[in-house]
């Protein structure tokens, strides 16, 4: 091996021909190709270069750098480093092999041409860019390709992985990602998206390290950061995010975490203890440097508003039906009309606050409404002379108490609450299956957790019956928010399972081993379902699973199941009970299938357990809305009917059972969702025991 710094006595030093004008040094990539036909296994030929000739002082020297060799059959160009004696275009370019960039080994000498992507301003002398290894190793020739790279670490870019990537992959990156300040993406999640893209387009993926170099060559200036809590941190690409219209937003394996990380860091709320009132003066000096928690939450709320339905139209309230009810002496029809106006304004203000995701103001809004002091000497609220421009006012607390003691007024207010809270649910969670950020989900759950306490505190001093009625409705609202956010969380977790081909195949294999005849035999005594219906559902489930259906397709299938099973009860007073019976039977059958999978130690038990939880919860959601549609009520009203077990009237249940008992005498044919066998045996002692 020869040392390139040996001076004129070194036989491995390159002789340079004087150029017309000196060219400033600039980092550059030069691609040359050896067209020799040296077979593999033959020792590489070493080029013996002549001794150095005197070089004019105005010629800039060529600095040693790294030369790497790649087999000629591979279109791979590795990275290295060089300081070249010519300029180049600093804009990022995609380099590919070109016939115009060849180095041919000929007896008469050698000719070197610059790659086709180099600018035309390169000097025309024949020794441009020819360098040797840092250690002075002679240039190795043979069949293959050489790539001479830029000389500074900060200017290294991956040409190899860009040239090796298909145009479809590069276009996919540009279509789905964009650079942005203050945002980040988990490195593992981005690579998982790439693997899915390769699987869909039948491409051979590169490894994670090579993909990282490809990302950096397409999106310049990316940095890597380790983000997350201690013990649960992940590497992130900082400065890149998914485009808002990218379909990958619905295909996240970790949607909640990614959605949170894609928020600009300056919008993240930093929850700090609230300052005391006596320290407000001291904290005013820092108000310009640090945003308050309220400001941070408002900024985050603006980001989250794209996930809610801010265009929801608030329905009209019904008029109170006083009938022949006698009002108290302290309550007049004038007061009832005033209550209608102010309560409508109060509910509209509540909807506006929730649409702006300013949950912390709900408590203040309730306190101001239910604890208003008298504004006049007689304690009576003023009404405008004309209804065209109603005056916004509040009723004093004692007047509200007197009005709420009237049963028709209390029931009217309960109906208004059902309409209000249903509108809030449809605003916050317009689609239970749509991915939403975990920060928004957690904010909704915290809001639901605080509702009952806020209302009880605001209504302190009101009669207990009034408080129970109001809290009963708000409890149904809070429970609905918790169920829907849990359903949304399950949907995002199951989405990754349903998109995994290997997991789906394993689930189908394990499901085919389940003895459904035994399941039907054990469940028939309890559920009394038609065997043909069970077999049809089993077949449809397997077909849908085999087709690797998406979550939306599964949701459509579940909706069709509910329609098919409950259609015979449409328009019947027994529809709500038939729907509840269907939920019980669906849950019982799915439990039997999970039991069989558990006993067989099925490899896909975890996937089935997750899918079962999701489908049970979504079936509950569908039945809830079907019952509400059949009864003409809101889903909040349907769920609020039995939300308080302590005040649940067993008399109503007994009356319902008695009414169903009369109908069972006329209909004892054992319909799929009719009375359970045990109840028919109780009403008909001569009924034979089946399934024992």
UniProtKB/Swiss-Prot annotation:
Compartments where found: Nucleus; Cytoplasm
Source organism superkingdom: Eukaryota
Region Disordered, residue ranges: 1-26, 261-296, 660-692
Chain positions with Phosphoserine modification: 26, 386
Chain's role: Transcription factor that acts as a key regulator of spermatogenesis. Acts by regulating expression of genes required for the haploid phase during spermiogenesis, such as genes required for cilium assembly and function. Recognizes and binds the X-box, a regulatory motif with DNA sequence 5'-GTNRCC(0-3N)RGYAAC-3' present on promoters. Probably activates transcription of the testis-specific histone gene H1-6.
Keyword line: Cilium biogenesis/degradation, Cytoplasm, Differentiation, DNA-binding, Nucleus, Phosphoprotein, Spermatogenesis, Transcription, Transcription regulation
Organism of provenance: Rattus norvegicus (Rat)
DNA-binding region coordinates: 169-244
Disulfides per UniProt: none
GO cellular component: cytoplasm; nucleus
Biased composition (Polar residues): 285-294
Residue spans of biased composition, Basic and acidic residues class: 660-685
Molecular-function GO term, any one: DNA-binding transcription activator activity, RNA polymerase II-specific
InterPro entries with a match to the protein in the record: DNA-bd_RFX, RFX-like, RFX1_trans_act, WH-like_DNA-bd_sf, WH_DNA-bd_sf
Record note on quaternary structure: Homodimer; probably only forms homodimers in testis. Heterodimer; heterodimerizes with RFX1 and RFX3.
Listed PANTHER family: DNA-BINDING PROTEIN RFX2, RFX TRANSCRIPTION FACTOR FAMILY
Matching SUPFAM superfamilies: Winged helix' DNA-binding domain (SSF46785)
Name of the protein in question: DNA-binding protein RFX2
Tissue specificity: Expressed at highest level in testis. Expressed at lower level in thymus. Also expressed in stomach, kidney, liver, brain and heart. Weakly expressed in spleen and lung. Within testis, most abundantly present in spermatocytes: present from pachytene spermatocytes to early spermatids (at protein level). Also present in non-germinal tissues.
Matches recorded under Pfam families: BCD_RFX, RFX1_trans_act, RFX_DNA_binding
Lineage: Eukaryota, Metazoa, Chordata, Craniata, Vertebrata
Biological processes, Gene Ontology terms: acrosome assembly; cellular response to leukemia inhibitory factor; cilium assembly; positive regulation of transcription by RNA polymerase II; regulation of transcription by RNA polymerase II; spermatid development
Family: Belongs to the RFX family.
């Amino acid at each position: 091996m020869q040392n390139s710094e040996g001076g004129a006595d070194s036989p491995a030093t390159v002789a340079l021909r004087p150029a017309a004008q000196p060219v400033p040094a600039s980092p550059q990539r030069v691609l040359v190709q050896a067209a020799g036909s040296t077979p593999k296994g033959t020792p590489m030929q070493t080029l013996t270069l002549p001794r150095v000739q005197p070089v004019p002082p105005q010629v800039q020297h060529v600095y040693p750098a790294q030369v790497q060799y790649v087999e000629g059959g591979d279109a791979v160009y590795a990275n290295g480093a060089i300081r070249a004696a010519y300029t180049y275009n600093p804009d990022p370019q995609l380099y590919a092999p070109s016939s115009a960039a060849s180095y041919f080994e000929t007896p008469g000498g050698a000719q070197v041409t610059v790659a086709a992507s180099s600018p035309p301003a390169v000097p025309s002398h024949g020794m441009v860019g020819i360098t040797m290894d840092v250690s002075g190793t002679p240039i190795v020739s043979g069949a293959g390709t050489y790539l001479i790279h830029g000389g500074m670490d900060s200017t290294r870019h991956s040409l190899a992985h860009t040239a090796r990537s298909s145009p479809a992959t590069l276009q996919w990156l540009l279509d789905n990602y964009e650079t942005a300040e203050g945002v980040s993406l988990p490195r593992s999640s981005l690579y998982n998206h790439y693997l899915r893209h390769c699987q869909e387009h039948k491409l051979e993926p590169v490894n994670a390290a090579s993909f990282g170099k490809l990302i950096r060559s397409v999106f310049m200036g990316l940095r890597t950061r380790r983000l997350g809590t201690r013990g649960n941190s992940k590497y992130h690409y900082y400065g890149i995010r998914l485009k808002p219209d990218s379909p990958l937003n619905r295909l996240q394996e970790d949607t909640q975490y990614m959605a949170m990380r894609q928020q600009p860091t300056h919008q993240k709320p930093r929850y700090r203890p609230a300052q005391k009132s006596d320290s407000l003066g001291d904290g005013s000096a820092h108000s310009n440097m640090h945003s308050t928690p309220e400001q941070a939450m408002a900024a985050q709320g603006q980001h989250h508003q794209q996930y809610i339905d801010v265009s929801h139209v608030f329905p009209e309230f019904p008029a109170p039906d006083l009938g022949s009810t006698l009002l108290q002496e302290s309550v007049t029809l004038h007061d009832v009309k005033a209550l209608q106006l102010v309560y409508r304004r109060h509910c509209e203000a509540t909807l506006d606050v929730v649409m702006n995701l300013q949950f912390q103001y709900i408590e203040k809004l309730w306190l101001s409404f239910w604890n208003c002091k008298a504004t006049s000497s007689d304690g009576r609220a003023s009404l405008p002379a004309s209804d065209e421009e109603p005056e916004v006012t509040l009723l004093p607390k004692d007047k509200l108490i007197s009005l709420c003691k009237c049963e028709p007024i209390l029931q009217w207010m309960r109906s208004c609450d059902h309409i209000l809270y249903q509108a809030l649910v449809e605003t916050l969670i317009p689609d239970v299956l749509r991915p939403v950020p975990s920060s928004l989900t957690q904010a909704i759950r915290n809001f639901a957790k605080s509702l009952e306490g806020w209302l009880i505190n605001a209504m302190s001093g009101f009669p207990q019956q009034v408080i129970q009625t109001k809290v009963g409705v708000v409890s149904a609202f809070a429970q609905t928010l918790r169920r829907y956010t849990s359903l949304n969380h399950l949907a995002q977790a199951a989405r990754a399972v349903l998109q995994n081909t290997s997991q789906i195949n394993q689930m189908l294999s394990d499901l085919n081993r389940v003895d459904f005849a035994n399941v039907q035999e054990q469940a028939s005594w309890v559920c009394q379902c038609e065997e043909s219906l069970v077999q049809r559902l089993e077949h449809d489930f397997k077909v849908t699973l085999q087709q690797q259906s998406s979550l939306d397709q599964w949701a459509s299938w579940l909706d069709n199941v509910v329609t098919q099973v409950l259609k015979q009860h449409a328009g019947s007073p027994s529809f709500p009970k038939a729907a509840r019976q269907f939920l019980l039977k669906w849950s019982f059958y799915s439990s039997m299938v999970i039991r069989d999978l558990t006993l067989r130690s099925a490899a896909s038990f975890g996937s089935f357990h997750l899918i079962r939880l999701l489908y049970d919860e979504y079936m509950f959601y569908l039945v809830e809305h079907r019952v509400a549609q059949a009864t003409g009520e809101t889903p909040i009203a349907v769920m609020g009917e039995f939300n308080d077990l302590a005040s649940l009237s067993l008399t109503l249940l007994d009356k319902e059972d008695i009414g169903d008992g009369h109908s069972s005498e006329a209909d004892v044919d054992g319909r799929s969702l009719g009375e359970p066998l045990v109840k028919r045996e109780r009403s008909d002692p001569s009924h034979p025991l089946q399934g024992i």
